[in-house]
């Protein structure tokens, strides 16, 4: 298992940031180079399960994720099926004087046959997560910053 951590500051209120990063309708639009589609299978209270089609290392992969939103300052995404099953992303949001600080920690799990790919996948995941968070930053700061 490998872990990666990405930190970013966004000049927008914490509740708005949490709502935006946990929302399913914008990823295929805002992050279209990586996320091909999202289909929500279940959505009850702050727990949802969705089927994602993602572009990973040039290949389109499918993953089923369980998302738990814990307002006002935490969200988790666990891959429960498909590519990278067992991967856990924990997102923490902290209020700052200028907006919100996001700390995104991802514990990457790959199948035993994929151990040689663990480091490249970790590096790719870090770069992909930074890109997605930067897209959120640009979008939110254009509206709130």
Each PLM stretch: what is its role?
Residues 1-7, 47-49, 62, 74, ...:
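Intrinsic-disorder/low-complexity, polar/charged segments enriched in Ser/Thr/Lys/Arg/Asp/Glu/Gln
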Residues 11-15, 42-46, 68-73, 92-101:
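A short, structured loop/turn motif at beta-sheet edges
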Residues 38-84, 134-143:
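Glycine-rich portal/gate segments that line the openings of hydrophobic small-molecule binding cavities
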Residues 7-9, 51-53, 68, 78, ...:
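Residue-level recognition of well-ordered beta-strand positions that form the cores
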Residues 79-131:
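Beta-strand/loop substructures that line and gate deep hydrophobic ligand-binding cavities in soluble
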Residues 25, 125, 129-145:
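Short amphipathic alpha-helical signal-transduction/dimerization elements
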Residues 1-45:
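Hydrophobic ligand-binding cavity/cleft-lining segments
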Residues 17-21, 27, 50, 67, ...:
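Hydrophobic pocket/interface hotspot
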